[in-house]
């Protein structure tokens, strides 16, 4: 019975983020502000309006937010890719709630994103991973998904170091 329940939870649908999801997304995001960045409600609404792809699993076991090259977004990481690639989809954040970890949600969100990117005629998905402090689990996860490192930077006045990754997707 436990295995069936675990499998059922792992197969929760992937749904588009709606405005009704914003309070829960904001809370989950800000629980992980050290790894991501703190968001205010107005900023989250703006970013979701700019998003190329924003999805959630379940009530909010996990979510992902991405932007294409045309987004009005001032993140130094997004701008790094914009300076180097004419067309791309940038993964801004993927968050999995603590109680939902280990269920494959991040993998499923990325796989669904890759399908969406391909259908949209895009061919490059980009992201960054913190290098300082190091995040070897995220490095390994992105390598397993087929991402390759293409650069690095020190940002926010030297407070943070990141590695930049890309993954080719058949368009």
Regions picked out by a protein language model, each given a short descriptive name:
Residues 2-40, 58-61:
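Short amphipathic alpha-helix that is part of the acyltransferase structural core
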Residues 131-151:
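Conserved active-site alpha-helix within GNAT-family acetyltransferase domains
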Residues 92-102, 130-131:
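A short, internal acetyl-CoA/4′-phosphopantetheine-binding micro-motif in the GNAT/acyltransferase core
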Residues 83, 152-171:
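C-terminal "cap" of GNAT-fold acetyltransferases
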Residues 96, 102-115, 144:
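Conserved acetyl-CoA-binding loop-helix of GNAT-fold acetyltransferases
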Residues 65-93:
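Conserved acyl-donor/pantetheine-binding loop and adjacent beta-alpha core of acyl/acetyltransferases
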Residues 117-132:
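Conserved GNAT acetyl-CoA-binding A-motif
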Residues 51-68:
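Conserved beta-hairpin
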């Amino acid at each position: 019975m436990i295995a069936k329940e675990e499998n059922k939870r792992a197969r929760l649908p992937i749904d588009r983020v709606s405005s009704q999801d914003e309070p829960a997304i904001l809370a989950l995001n800000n629980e992980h502000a050290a790894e991501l960045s703190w968001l205010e409600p107005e900023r989250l609404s703006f970013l979701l309006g700019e998003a190329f792809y924003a999805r959630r699993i379940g009530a909010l076991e996990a979510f992902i937010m991405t932007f294409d090259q045309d987004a009005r977004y001032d993140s130094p990481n997004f701008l790094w890719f914009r300076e180097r690639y004419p067309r791309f989809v940038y993964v801004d954040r993927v968050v999995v709630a603590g109680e939902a970890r280990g269920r494959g949600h991040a993998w499923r969100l990325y796989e669904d994103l890759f399908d969406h990117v391909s259908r949209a005629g895009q061919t490059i998905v980009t992201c960054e991973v913190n290098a300082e402090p190091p995040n070897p689990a995220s490095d390994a996860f992105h390598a397993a998904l087929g991402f390759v490192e293409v650069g690095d930077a020190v940002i926010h006045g030297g407070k943070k170091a990141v590695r930049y990754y890309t993954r080719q997707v058949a368009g």
